[in-house]
């Protein structure tokens, strides 16, 4: 395996992500227990801390909510945990603003307003997540009103500074986030079950591959190759694919007759783009002895127009007539006008030399038909 010189060798493979470790869960449970004890001590004590008592209690209840989310649903820490963390930071900022004066107080107020806007935006984002999970407009409206109701009750608790009211407000905030957590857990699980992949159905890629194989088999059934070669070991005189769609050559990588394709190696070395061909015609080879008719897709060999009899040593003249008597069904038929078997194609060929004599030095022309 080649290593990237700039990045260095790869490091050790990371273990797959699994459920949280028992040690992390135990630590979270311990922190949750401590937070509950501190919260109960603040709420139930006779300490007259004023508004700071309400803020400390609210900060502890937010920490408790974050720990509950971490223990039961860590995947929901991003929307719910971030909202609780942002509310906790705003609460600590308010505690700090209680003892600030002058320019620091104004700067703290600006940060407080900015934090409130972030909380509002994050709450709207959370409602959008609930909407995507299938929440109705009435459920979203209920969560929205409950959130603002808790905010109003928190402001009232700051004004009243009563322990029982503070306890009530904190419990309402806890119930709000627990309700959202339970709703997201239930509907998120149902949403994933509804969109679960059914193994009994074929995979989309598998279905595409099957249809592709069927189309290839259908096209191969209707494809017929015609190969006309000269006698002896000479170069072939003509090759044509009659069954390709549209009447043109096909670009398949492997054909039975090795004609009319762009494969790198063909036994007959005709009608392909190989670099070296014995006849050096109809190819894109860089070096050709005759330097004629190169770089063309299908160019015939030079022919002398002055020789009307065709005795210029070129290939024999080929004349073909294709008739499709069966519509689009079956292989295309070829006829020489003389009848014959209607199920087999025939070919009308000219001769080279002296107009059809048997003393042709190249011998008779051979016809091979492949299904």
Swiss-Prot record:
It is a multi-pass membrane protein. One of its GO terms (cellular component) is membrane. It is found in: Host cell membrane. A motif (Interaction with host TRAF proteins) lies at residues 204-208. Interacts (via PXQXT motif) with host tumor necrosis factor receptor-associated factor (TRAF) proteins TRAF1, TRAF2, TRAF3 and TRAF5. Interacts with human protein ZMYND11; leading to negatively regulate NF-kappa-B activation. Interacts with host UBE2I; this interaction induces the sumoylation of various cellular proteins. Interacts with host IRF7. Interacts with host TYK2. Two regions, C-terminal-activating region 1 (CTAR1) and CTAR2, have been identified within the cytoplasmic carboxy terminal domain that activates NF-kappa-B. This is Latent membrane protein 1.
